[in-house]
Structure formats: C-alpha cells, structure tokens
Amino acid sequence: MTRRSVSRKRRANPGSGPGEQSDWDHSAHKRKRLPPEKKSLVFYLKSRELKPHNDSTYLHLLRGHAACTLPSILSEREFHLGNLNKVFASQWLNHRQVVCGTKCNTLFVVDVQTGQITRIPILKDREPINGSHQSCGIHAIEINPSRTLLATGGDNPNSIAVYRLPTLDPVCVGDGGHNDWIFSIAWISDTMAVSGSRDGSMGLWEMTDEVVNKSDFQHGLSRVPVYSHISHKALKDIPKESSNPVNCKVRALAFNSNNKELGAVSLDGFFHLWKAEQTLSKLLSTKLPYCRENVCLAYGLEWSLYAVGSQAHVSFLDPRQPPHCAKSVYCREQGSGIRSVSFYEHIVTVGTGQGALLFYDIRAQRFLEDSTGNCRNAKKKGDTLKLSTGKGWLNHNEMWLNYFSDIDCCPNAVYTHCYDSSGTKLFVAGGPLPTGLHGNYAGLWS
C-alpha cells in the first residue's frame, strides 16, 4: 500500500486594512520553540549566572522568552531622592549604579542596592551664563558604544558636557553651538555625538584623542576638576516644514548604527532622517501619523524600526517603506501623552504621563496581557498588563495648594526608563506631569 503525500502549505494571511503595516516581515525573526522545561524564568536566570552555554542563538531565545515573561512578575522598590525635581534622563552605569539628570539641573548616581545618592559636579561654559537665563534641567544622558564616555547637559542647558567612565571625571564642554536648551543627545561613534536643541538645530561634536588625553594630563596635575572646551564640528537646522516655525524644535534623537542614520523628531509633528558620519546630511522628512506631543523616540536595531511616542499612540516607522505603511498602536492613555519608549528584544516598553508602564509585543502586534490577574491595575485576568509607579515625593507648594490639593494622588509621569544589561531590572523615574508641580519619583522594578 502506497502512502499518500500530504501538502502542508500554509494558508495565506488575510490582507490588512488601510493604514495597517501589512508588509512587516516577521519571517526573519521567527524563533525556534524552547522545550517546556527550558521556558522557566528560573532556568533562564540560572543559565545566565552559570553561563554554561556559548550558543548565541540559544541565549537569544532565552532572552526573548524572559523579555515576554518578566514584566508580569516585576515588583517595585522606590528610592528616596529628597527634594529633587523631576528626573528626566537615566542610564545604567553598571549592575548596581544608575546615573540620572533632573529638571533642577542635578546630575547624580543612585546605588540601586543601598539607595545611596551621589551628586556629580555640573560642568560650566567658558563664559559665565547670563543671570536671567532660566535652566530647564538635564533632559539627556547617553553613553558611547565602548562605554568610556558619557554625554549630558551642562550647567548651561544649551551646552553638552562629557565625562569619562567609569570614574565620571570631566572631559570637556561643548558650548557656543546652540542658543536654546538641549533636549536630546545621540552618539554616532565612539568619539562623536549629536545634540538636538529647542532652537531647531542639531550639533555635531567630536571628542578627539587630543581632548581626551589633555583632560587625562590635567587631572594628573590638579586636585580640582579641570576640563577642555570644544566647538561644534557641524551645526544643521532641521527643515522648517510647518506653517509655524516656532514648533520646529528637535525633541528626540535615535541612531541606527547599521546604516549610520540618525532619526530626529520635531515638535511640529515631523520625523527627519539624516546620514550621520563625519557630517550630517538630510535624507528625508515625513509627517508623523499622530503629530501632537511627539517627545520620545527609540530605534529597534533588530526590527529596523523607529518608535515615536505621541499624545496617545506609539507609531512604528520603517524609513525604507512609504509613510502610509506606518503602523500606530493606541495606548489608552489619552491626554497624558507617551513620555518614554524603548526596545528590548521584541518588547517595546512605553512610559506614560499617568505613571503607567505598558509592554507592546512587536511579534504578536499587541500589548502584553496580565496572565495572573494580580497586577495592581488589572480588573481581571487577561487585561492589558499595566504597571503603575508609586507615589514618589511631591512638594505641597503654592501651585499644589491652589489647583491640586483636592486630588488624593498626583501620578508621576514616566519621563525615563532603562533596562540593565541582563534585561531583568528596569529602572523607572520621573515626576509630576503639570509644569508648576515640584516632585520626583524613582524606582527599580525587578
């Protein structure tokens, strides 16, 4: 008896509706299924600790599974930051230290094991700042690829300050470039960084060997911190696409290291793409599908996608595709805005102005659900997984007394969040969303 051959062709997926990104190709990102016993989070942590496996594919599978599983079991530990006002930026320095920048222009390091806060001296311009200058604080902290230099804002929020890692000794200040606040910074190589300013320009700064070695020599001769002053290598204005040029402010930057391309978001609702190597050359500008309150941007290298936050949506842009192919997801946080966004494996983490953390699965194209029903905000099992920040600290100032004293709890906007290198710890920080309120929040979710 002959055995009949059976066709196992898969049925084609139905076409997507208008505005849906039907051409997302997930075949390149299909992963082998793990055996049931190896899907355990405990197994992942044990294997990471013992490191018996050298197979990068296997470790990639484990990291992907952990990224999807961890959010539902994270628990919060708050840190007390005193009377600091609104944490705008943060980066992990190592497995136990996170560096942060605030609206009150304070740069500090928090030890996530002890909760100890250490303040870092702010670097000043070569010329004193005008006394009438109002500081907006530190909005950006970025570390170069080799993790040897850290770039952030200076005492003058229009200037870029660079520190050496891991010591946080000062290296240089880039001043005289922008005439308004720096909102974002991106490293495009180990020695070159780009700053995006509220004046609508992007500055290219180079930390040459001469500058770095000079600061080394000066530190050896003096007990007082000394540093160099550098000028921009290039200064480019973003295109004034809108009818209101006042809104042409560079709000966020993200770098694609594979293609050497720099994405920029401006407050007039446009996404700009630049070739970023030894200089900046414009490639394209496109209107965003949702163009209100575009204040955060991230790039997912594995997915070749930019994620842009707006008032109530996260939009995913692939510069290789026509603008109408952009996919946007509604975050159910209308009115408060998306304040921070990041990629980790196939999960996009979203921080909102209402103090919520949401987790979007790019492969499944949906938000993670609460599989346990134990989440603080979940009404029932299967609801969208939402983690809510703690109370933090709030100054009961005149603004609060006049306008917010009848509110039981003022939520803390998630202005910044970042995963550690293992992907098992999530640092989250921010403060009250209303401009006149003074307060802070910082917590470790692990």
From Swiss-Prot:
<dbReference type="InterPro" id="IPR001680">
    <property type="entry name" value="WD40_rpt"/>
</dbReference>
<dbReference type="GO" id="GO:0016567">
    <property type="term" value="P:protein ubiquitination"/>
</dbReference>
<dbReference type="GO" id="GO:1990756">
    <property type="term" value="F:ubiquitin-like ligase-substrate adaptor activity"/>
</dbReference>
<keyword id="KW-0677">Repeat</keyword>
<dbReference type="GO" id="GO:0080008">
    <property type="term" value="C:Cul4-RING E3 ubiquitin ligase complex"/>
</dbReference>
<feature type="region of interest" description="Disordered">
    <location>
        <begin position="1"/>
        <end position="32"/>
    </location>
</feature>
<dbReference type="InterPro" id="IPR015943">
    <property type="entry name" value="WD40/YVTN_repeat-like_dom_sf"/>
</dbReference>
<feature type="compositionally biased region" description="Basic residues">
    <location>
        <begin position="1"/>
        <end position="12"/>
    </location>
</feature>
<dbReference type="GO" id="GO:0005634">
    <property type="term" value="C:nucleus"/>
</dbReference>
<dbReference type="GO" id="GO:0010506">
    <property type="term" value="P:regulation of autophagy"/>
</dbReference>
<protein>
    <recommendedName>
        <fullName>DDB1- and CUL4-associated factor 12-A</fullName>
    </recommendedName>
</protein>
<feature type="repeat" description="WD 2">
    <location>
        <begin position="177"/>
        <end position="215"/>
    </location>
</feature>
<feature type="repeat" description="WD 1">
    <location>
        <begin position="132"/>
        <end position="173"/>
    </location>
</feature>
<dbReference type="GO" id="GO:0005813">
    <property type="term" value="C:centrosome"/>
</dbReference>
<feature type="repeat" description="WD 3">
    <location>
        <begin position="245"/>
        <end position="284"/>
    </location>
</feature>
<dbReference type="GO" id="GO:0140627">
    <property type="term" value="P:ubiquitin-dependent protein catabolic process via the C-end degron rule pathway"/>
</dbReference>
<dbReference type="Pfam" id="PF23760">
    <property type="entry name" value="Beta-prop_DCAF12"/>
</dbReference>
<keyword id="KW-0833">Ubl conjugation pathway</keyword>
<comment type="subunit">
    <text>Component of the DCX(DCAF12) E3 ubiquitin ligase complex, at least composed of cul4 (cul4a or cul4b), ddb1, dcaf12 and rbx1.</text>
</comment>
<keyword id="KW-0963">Cytoplasm</keyword>
<keyword id="KW-0853">WD repeat</keyword>
<keyword id="KW-0206">Cytoskeleton</keyword>
<dbReference type="GO" id="GO:0005737">
    <property type="term" value="C:cytoplasm"/>
</dbReference>
<dbReference type="InterPro" id="IPR036322">
    <property type="entry name" value="WD40_repeat_dom_sf"/>
</dbReference>
<comment type="similarity">
    <text>Belongs to the WD repeat DCAF12 family.</text>
</comment>
<dbReference type="InterPro" id="IPR051191">
    <property type="entry name" value="DCAF12"/>
</dbReference>
<feature type="repeat" description="WD 4">
    <location>
        <begin position="333"/>
        <end position="370"/>
    </location>
</feature>
<comment type="pathway">
    <text>Protein modification; protein ubiquitination.</text>
</comment>
<dbReference type="InterPro" id="IPR019775">
    <property type="entry name" value="WD40_repeat_CS"/>
</dbReference>
<dbReference type="InterPro" id="IPR056151">
    <property type="entry name" value="Beta-prop_DCAF12"/>
</dbReference>
<keyword id="KW-0539">Nucleus</keyword>
<comment type="function">
    <text>Substrate-recognition component of a DCX (DDB1-CUL4-X-box) E3 ubiquitin-protein ligase complex of the DesCEND (destruction via C-end degrons) pathway, which recognizes a C-degron located at the extreme C terminus of target proteins, leading to their ubiquitination and degradation. The C-degron recognized by the DesCEND pathway is usually a motif of less than ten residues and can be present in full-length proteins, truncated proteins or proteolytically cleaved forms.</text>
</comment>
